[in-house]
């Protein structure tokens, strides 16, 4: 169902189970934004639960596609729904729509993660993805996570930045010269 989540749940679960069978050690799914924006939260939660079951013991990242959700309240509701339905990580974006990862979305999602942790004692990971192109932008997301969720979140198991360009930029910024090792 990537990137739009617009396929049947049977296809989504079959794809997930096949990926796990073929060796995937993590699974991603995209929130059914159409159902969510229509107020059909039950369908959204049911889909996440079924995909989580197909993941076996592997972590599930639920992509909220925050740019399509359009408001802080929708982002928070989607984050809470995803966590209670079984997400191990919540992720900002597929990177396939114009508005991808934003600091506002990161702030709202991290606040929801903190509230969820305070209520349940369960750590949920956060991944900023889509449109992060510079070291400075990555540092901004790092700062949001550190300030809201604390130092315990600044590790691979709980915080990630997804980008196709950033690794080379970071190495170049550290070394002070243009390099392309990745």
Name these PLM-found stretches.
Residues 1-126, 133-164, 168, 172-182:
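Alpha/beta enzyme core
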């Amino acid at each position: 169902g990537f990137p739009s989540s617009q396929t049947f749940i049977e296809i989504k679960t079959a794809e997930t189970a096949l990926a796990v069978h073929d060796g995937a050690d993590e699974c991603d799914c995209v929130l059914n934004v159409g159902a969510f924006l229509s107020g059909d939260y039950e369908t959204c939660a049911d889909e996440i639960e079924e995909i989580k079951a197909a993941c076996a013991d592997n972590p599930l990242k639920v992509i909220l596609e925050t740019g399509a959700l359009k408001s802080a309240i929708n982002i928070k509701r989607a984050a809470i729904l995803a966590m209670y339905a079984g997400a191990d990580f919540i992720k900002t974006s597929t990177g396939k729509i114009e508005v991808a990862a934003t600091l506002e979305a990161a702030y709202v999602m991290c606040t929801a993660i903190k509230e969820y942790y305070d209520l349940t004692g369960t750590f949920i990971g956060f991944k900023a993805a889509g449109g992060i192109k510079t070291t400075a932008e990555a540092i901004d997301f790092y700062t949001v996570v550190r300030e809201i969720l604390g130092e315990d979140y600044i590790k691979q198991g709980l915080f990630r930045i997804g980008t196709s360009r950033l690794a080379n930029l970071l190495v170049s910024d550290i070394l002070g010269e243009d390099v392309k090792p990745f």
